[in-house]
A protein has these predicted regions:
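P-loop NTP-binding core
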Residues: 1-263
Length: 263
């Protein structure tokens, strides 16, 4: 990393639920960690699926991202090591579902996460991946304000691109106000099915509209990806040879190559 005092922060966002945000956070995180990047997944979804999927028991989440944002608890006190070397998680619980409302009252409301990550709080990491909730609410805005870039998982399904224009509008608004330097890291096609016309159609449309922003790597629909969370491990540990594992390793490498090329 060029700036050793803090990590590169990437918000994984899409206001649609079930498009692969959490799956991407867990498995891209694990893949980056295997590539030697010290990686933190910051769970910003009250459902806490990334936390559960990485083995943080719901009964064992004393300090969470809620405390980070609303109680000024230092990041170092809430992070947990995962089963993967170089991979940590800042867990979330349902507490976070009320955070949105509590944050509205604060005049600093869109900068609360950014402030929590200031003062070299992320200096021990190379990359922080923020798993956003399925909404363009204040939590997601906080993630975009704190982030260097947004990574967008795009489900290879009908209507995928319609939701995207709303997301792009929000990114533009954040740029015009609280975070002018916010970039789009890239758009990754998820749950891709080579044999399905619709998948190919979504891919063609996405590449035509978004050009190089769309990663060459596509994440295939792979049952191993949906099974791994019930074992509390990333697919790279559950089934390293699976197509899902291979795809997330390829995505990690593509991301790192791109970054090195533009650094
Ligand atoms: P989001 O975080 O955007 O709501 P998830 O990552 O939780 O989406 O994915 C929604 C569901 O789809 C989960 O059950 C997950 O296991 C499954 N899933 C995600 N990506 C894939 C994939 N590439 N292949 C098969 N199942 C997937
Ligand atoms: Mg999720």
């Amino acid at each position: 990393m060029s700036d050793a005092t803090r990590a590169r922060i990437i918000a994984i966002a899409n206001q649609k639920g079930g498009v692969g945000k959490t799956t991407t956070a867990i498995n891209l995180g694990a893949a980056l960690a295997l590539e030697g990047q010290r990686t933190l997944i910051l769970d910003l979804d009250p459902q806490g699926n990334a936390s559960t999927g990485l083995g943080v028991d719901a009964r064992n989440r004393d300090l969470t991202t809620y405390d980070l944002i609303l109680e000024d608890t230092p990041l170092a006190e809430i992070i947990r090591k995962t089963s993967v070397e170089n991979l940590w998680i800042a867990p979330a619980t349902t507490d976070l579902s009320s955070a949105d409302i509590e944050m509205v009252a604060n005049e600093n409301r869109v900068f609360m996460l950014k402030d929590s990550l200031a003062n070299r709080a992320t200096k021990d990491f190379d990359i922080v991946l923020i798993d956003c909730p399925p909404s363009l609410n204040l939590l997601t805005i906080n993630a975009m304000v704190a982030a260097d870039a947004v990574l967008v998982p795009l489900q290879s399904e009908f209507f995928a691109l319609e939701g995207l224009s709303q997301l792009m509008l929000t990114i533009r608004e954040v740029r015009q106000t609280a975070n002018p330097a916010l970039r789009i890291e890239g758009v990754v096609l998820t749950m891709y099915d080579q044999r399905n016309n619709l998948s190919r159609q979504v891919e063609d449309d996405a590449r035509e509209t978004l050009g190089d922003l769309v990663y060459a790597t596509r994440i295939p629909r792979n049952v191993r990806l949906s099974e791994a969370p019930s074992y509390s491990i990333p697919v790279l540990e559950y089934d390293p040879a699976s197509s899902g594992s291979q795809a997330y390793m390829n995505l990690a490498r593509e991301m790192l190559d791109r970054h090195l090329a533009t650094a």
